[in-house]
C-alpha cells in the first residue's frame, strides 16, 4: 500500500528523515526530483549493520551546485512505514556544497543514474520509488509531493506520498502533462509550459524545462528573465543575488501565469517573493522585498529554459508519475496564501 513521509521545509530545500540499516540510523536527506542517486555521508557518517553490503562500484555525481564521490552499498532503507531491502546508496568519502543535509534522496528519472557508477558505467540504479514499486510495496510507480510556504527557517509542513496521491493536500483536480520530448529537459521531470506576466506580457513562449524540488528559486532563461525584470521594475540586489523591489513596486506586482497541460496556474504576487520576515536569513534587508524568480544563466531555445523550483512547488501539489510518464500539478489551499 502507498505510504507517506513528512518533509521539513528548511527555507532553501526540503529534507526527509530516511532510515538506513537494521537497526536503522536516521539521515536527513534533501528531496530532489532533479537527480536520481540516493546517497549519504555529507554530515552524519554511514553506520554499517548486518544489512549493509558493499558492491564493487564507486559512485560519483556532479550537481548544479556541489558534488559527491564515494562507494556504492546496498542496504535496507526505511521511509516512514515503507521498507526497501537492498536499496543502492552512495556513501560519500568526498562531498561539497551540502551544508545542513546528510545527503540526497534522488527521485528523478532512473536513467539519470547511468554513468554514475564505476566500473559499471552503463548500469542504472533504481530509485527508492522504482524499488518500492518493483518489490510490490506500492501499487504504482509514482511520487506525490506536498510543499507549503514557511515563515520559519525549519518547518515540517510537507509530505511525500509514494504510490498514491493524497486528496487532502490539494484542491480541485490534478492536471497531467506528458514528459516533454525536448532534450535535455526530457531526461528529467521535464514539461512544456508558457509563462506570462499579468494579463498580456509574454515572458516565455511554449518551451521545455523541468520541475525540480532540489532547486530553491524558480529559474527562467536569461532573455525571459530580462523581460520579467523590466516588467516588474526590479533591480539586482548584490547582497542576496535576488531581484529587489520597493514596497511601492510590490503593491503593483502582477501574477505570473504558467500554462501547463492546457491549464493555467497562477503564481500570485505574494508567491513571487521571499518570505519577508526571513529576508535577513539570506543577507537581505528587513524593509525590502525580494523576488524568487531568478536567471537560469542561458538563453531560451536550448531545450531546458526554466526550472520550476521549491518556491513554485510551495504553491502547487506535484505528482511524478513514472508509470504513465507524466507530471501532475494541482492547486492547494496555499496557492493564494499571503504569508510571504
Curated annotation (Swiss-Prot):
Entry-linked InterPro entries: Aspartic_peptidase_A1, Aspartic_peptidase_AS, Pepsin-like_dom, PEPTIDASE_A1, Peptidase_aspartic_dom_sf
Reaction catalysis annotation: Milk clotting activity, broad specificity, but fails to cleave 15-Leu-|-Tyr-16 or 16-Tyr-|-Leu-17 of insulin B chain
SUPFAM superfamilies associated with the record: Acid proteases
UniProt domain Peptidase A1: residue ranges: 14-330
UniProt entry keywords in alphabetical sequence: Aspartyl protease, Glycoprotein, Hydrolase, Protease
Single annotated GO MF: aspartic-type endopeptidase activity
Residues linked to a glycan: 192, 238
BP GO terms, sorted: proteolysis
Pfam family name, one: Asp
Signal peptide location: none
Residue stretches in coiled coil: none
Matching Gene3D superfamilies: Acid Proteases (2.40.70.10)
EC annotation from Swiss-Prot or TrEMBL: 3.4.23.29
Active site: 32, 212
Family: Belongs to the peptidase A1 family.
Protein name listed in UniProt: Polyporopepsin
Species classification: Eukaryota, Fungi, Dikarya, Basidiomycota, Agaricomycotina
Amino acid at each position: 500500500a502507498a505510504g507517506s513521509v513528512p518533509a521539513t521545509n528548511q527555507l532553501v530545500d526540503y529534507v526527509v528523515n530516511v532510515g538506513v540499516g537494521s537497526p536503522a540510523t536516521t539521515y536527513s536527506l534533501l528531496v530532489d526530483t532533479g537527480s536520481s542517486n540516493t546517497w549519504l555521508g555529507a554530515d552524519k557518517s554511514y553506520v554499517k549493520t548486518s544489512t549493509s553490503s558493499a558492491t564493487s562500484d564507486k559512485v560519483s555525481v556532479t550537481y548544479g551546485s556541489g558534488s559527491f564521490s564515494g562507494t556504492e552499498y546496498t542496504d535496507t532503507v526505511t521511509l516512514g512505514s515503507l521498507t526497501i531491502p537492498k536499496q543502492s546508496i552512495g556513501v560519500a568519502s568526498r562531498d561539497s556544497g551540502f551544508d545542513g543535509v546528510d545527503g540526497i534522496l534522488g527521485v528523478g528519472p532512473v536513467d539519470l543514474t547511468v554513468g554514475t557508477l564505476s566500473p559499471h558505467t552503463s548500469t542504472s540504479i533504481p530509485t527508492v520509488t522504482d524499488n518500492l514499486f518493483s518489490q510490490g510495496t506500492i501499487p504504482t510507480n509514482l511520487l506525490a509531493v506536498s510543499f507549503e510556504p514557511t515563515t520559519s527557517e525549519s518547518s515540517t509542513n510537507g509530505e511525500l506520498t509514494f504510490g498514491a496521491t493524497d486528496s487532502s493536500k490539494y484542491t480541485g483536480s490534478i492536471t497531467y502533462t506528458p514528459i516533454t520530448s525536448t532534450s535535455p529537459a526530457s531526461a528529467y521531470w521535464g514539461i512544456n509550459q508558457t509563462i506570462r506576466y499579468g494579463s498580456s506580457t509574454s515572458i516565455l513562449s511554449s518551451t521545455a524545462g523541468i520541475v525540480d524540488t532540489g532547486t530553491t528559486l524558480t529559474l527562467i532563461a536569461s532573455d525571459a528573465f530580462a523581460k520579467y525584470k523590466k516588467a516588474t521594475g526590479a533591480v539586482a540586489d548584490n547582497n542576496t543575488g535576488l531581484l529587489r523591489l520597493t514596497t511601492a513596486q510590490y503593491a503593483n506586482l502582477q501574477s505570473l501565469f504558467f500554462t501547463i497541460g492546457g491549464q493555467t496556474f497562477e503564481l500570485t504576487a505574494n508567491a513571487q517573493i521571499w518570505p519577508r520576515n526571513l529576508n535577513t536569513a539570506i543577507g537581505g534587508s528587513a524593509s525590502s522585498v525580494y523576488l524568487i524568480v531568478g536567471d537560469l544563466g542561458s538563453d531560451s531555445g536550448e531545450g531546458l529554459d526554466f526550472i520550476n523550483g521549491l518556491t513554485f512547488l510551495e504553491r502547487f501539489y506535484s505528482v511524478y508519475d513514472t508509470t504513465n510518464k507524466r507530471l501532475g500539478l494541482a492547486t492547494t489551499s496555499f496557492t493564494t496564501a499571503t504569508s510571504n
